[in-house]
Amino acid sequence: MKKTTLIKEGKAKRLYNTDEKDLVWVEYMDQATALNGKRKDHIAGKGELNNQIDCILFEQLVAKGIHTDFVQKLSNNEQLNRKVKIIPLEVVVRNAASGSFQRKFDVSYLQAFDQPVVEFFYKSDELDDPFINTNKAIALKIIDLEESQRLEKMALEINQILKERFAKAHLQLVDFKVEFGKTADDEIVLADEISPDSCRLVDLTTKESLDKDVFRKKTGDLVTVYQEVLNRLNNSQEEVHG
């Protein structure tokens, strides 16, 4: 397996073609962004931490039957994925109030929901990723009704698996963002990444933030926090596999 030409460089990853046409080589970068990329910082070690966390979580999801683009971990900051066409929607699942939801509806921080809230956002940095409902997504031919139902069902299944996995690491999954893509045979699969860049995590007891919010709000050291998440996931691996 060889890495060949660069496909694109995003906010946190570089994607490369390989000598196998259906596979893509993903390299995680030492870059942190906020405000849809308007703020950028180089943070040494971040790429390796995100990749390792992502691989642990995707391996868990695959083991539980979730269809994904993940193939294998290549190194501490690289992995191999199936090539997919990304659906331009960010699917957000919320288990408790935080972030924009908390501000918009003026509710208490970490107020728990009786059932998870699933939201779609149109994936566009230029438009600041606006909220979009199912009818609008269908009107814009981003997805059809059956696909919207499939995305919501998969997102809720992923949420349940992640909640249980993080709980074993003494972490509460407050909310998270995922993206989906279509394979060459039109199968919808989970794609992109799951890491503290895309999840809100707090300690189960102290409610201390252990995610990218420490970078957004400048309240802590991102590498220290991400290393703590990785350590907790690694330390709870034996229990998961036991």
Swiss-Prot record:
Q: Where would one find the signal peptide in this protein? A: none
Listed pathway(s): Purine metabolism; IMP biosynthesis via de novo pathway; 5-amino-1-(5-phospho-D-ribosyl)imidazole-4-carboxamide from 5-amino-1-(5-phospho-D-ribosyl)imidazole-4-carboxylate: step 1/2
Q: Which domain of life is it from?
A: Bacteria
Name the Gene3D superfamilies for this protein: ATP-grasp fold, B domain (3.30.470.20), Phosphorylase Kinase, domain 1 (3.30.200.20)
Q: Which transformation does this protein catalyse, written as a reaction? A: 5-amino-1-(5-phospho-D-ribosyl)imidazole-4-carboxylate + L-aspartate + ATP = (2S)-2-[5-amino-1-(5-phospho-beta-D-ribosyl)imidazole-4-carboxamido]succinate + ADP + phosphate + 2 H(+)
EC numbers on record: 6.3.2.6
Q: List the disulfide bonds.
A: none
Question: What keywords were assigned to this record?
Answer: ATP-binding, Ligase, Nucleotide-binding, Purine biosynthesis
GO BP terms in the entry? 'de novo' IMP biosynthetic process; cobalamin biosynthetic process
Q: Does the keyword Nucleotide-binding apply?
A: yes
Molecular function (GO) terms for this protein are: ATP binding; phosphoribosylaminoimidazolesuccinocarboxamide synthase activity
Q: Tell me if Ligase is a UniProt keyword of this record.
A: yes
Question: Sorted alphabetically, which InterPro entries does this protein's record hold?
Answer: SAICAR_synt/ADE2_N, SAICAR_synt_PurC, SAICAR_synth, SAICAR_synthetase, SAICAR_synthetase_CS
Q: Which HAMAP family match?
A: SAICAR_synth
Family according to the record: Belongs to the SAICAR synthetase family.
Protein's name according to its UniProt entry: Phosphoribosylaminoimidazole-succinocarboxamide synthase
